[in-house]
């Protein structure tokens, strides 16, 4: 009878096998701990099978149950997920180029992430966006210098306007407090627009052309025959 009770207890220990295998505590556990649990379950199922069960002693049955329970208790997926989230949030806090709204969005995503792999992906996205934001901030860092330059001052009105609009769009992204831009491609496009419109400023060329025209007029005056 004791052996029958032991077999019942062993069977009960496997009742939550499917639930356990589908849990975060198993999915995100260390591989060795996952293997220990699945091996313990396989061993227990072998004992419970009619083909092999009759050969197992009461002690072996009890040991199999203890092995299943111990392996299940040792699963550390929940701990691994919590640790991954904590580390990701610490790394997020150290990013200096994304704005607060972007940072809060990533923090919320990390909190809600169901798996360690999701946390890793979010962390990588944050790093990528931070780099894009660094380039965007750099593109407008010399805005005041550019506005005071001859290249801007003597540029055609359309090119001045193009540059001003690009800088405004960039600053709008940088200074967002709600609904932040989270796609690095959008940030990179804004950076490219600032850089391209800055390069396109033609004030220096216009000044050179104006000087050349003035020189040409002077030459014509000096070389024109007297009436």
Language-model regions: role of each:
Residues 1, 15, 19-25, 65, ...:
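Generic ordered-secondary-structure signal
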Residues 1-10, 45-83, 106-137, 171-208:
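Repeat-associated, polar segments at repeat-unit boundaries in modular proteins
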Residues 5-22, 77-96, 131-148, 203-221:
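Disulfide-bonded cysteine-rich modules in secreted/extracellular proteins
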Residues 26-30, 154-156:
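Solvent-exposed, low-complexity, repeat-rich "mucin-like" stalks and linkers
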Residues 33-40, 84, 100, 159-166:
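Short amphipathic alpha-helical heptad-repeat segments
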Residues 222-227:
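Conserved small/polar residues in nucleotide/adenosyl-binding loops
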């Amino acid at each position: 009878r004791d052996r029958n009770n032991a077999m019942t207890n062993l069977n009960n220990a496997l009742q939550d096998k499917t639930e356990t295998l589908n849990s975060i505590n198993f999915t995100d556990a260390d591989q060795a701990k996952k293997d220990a649990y699945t091996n313990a379950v396989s061993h227990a199922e072998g004992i419970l099978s009619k083909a092999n069960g009759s050969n197992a002693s009461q002690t072996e049955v009890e040991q199999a149950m203890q092995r299943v329970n111990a392996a299940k208790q040792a699963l550390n997926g929940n701990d691994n997920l919590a640790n991954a989230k904590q580390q990701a949030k610490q790394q997020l806090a150290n990013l200096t180029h994304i704005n607060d709204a972007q940072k809060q969005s990533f923090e919320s995503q990390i909190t809600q992430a169901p798996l360690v792999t999701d946390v890793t992906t979010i962390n990588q996205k944050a790093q990528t966006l931070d780099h894009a934001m660094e380039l965007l901030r750099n593109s407008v860092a010399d805005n005041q210098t550019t506005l005071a330059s001859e290249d801007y001052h003597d540029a055609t009105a359309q090119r001045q306007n193009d540059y001003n609009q690009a800088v405004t769009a960039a600053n709008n992204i940088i200074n967002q407090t709600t609904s932040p831009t989270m796609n690095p491609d959008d940030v990179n496009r804004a950076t490219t627009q600032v850089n391209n419109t800055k390069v396109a400023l033609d004030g220096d060329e216009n000044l050179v052309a104006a000087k050349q025209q003035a020189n040409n007029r002077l030459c014509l005056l000096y070389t024109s025959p007297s009436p």
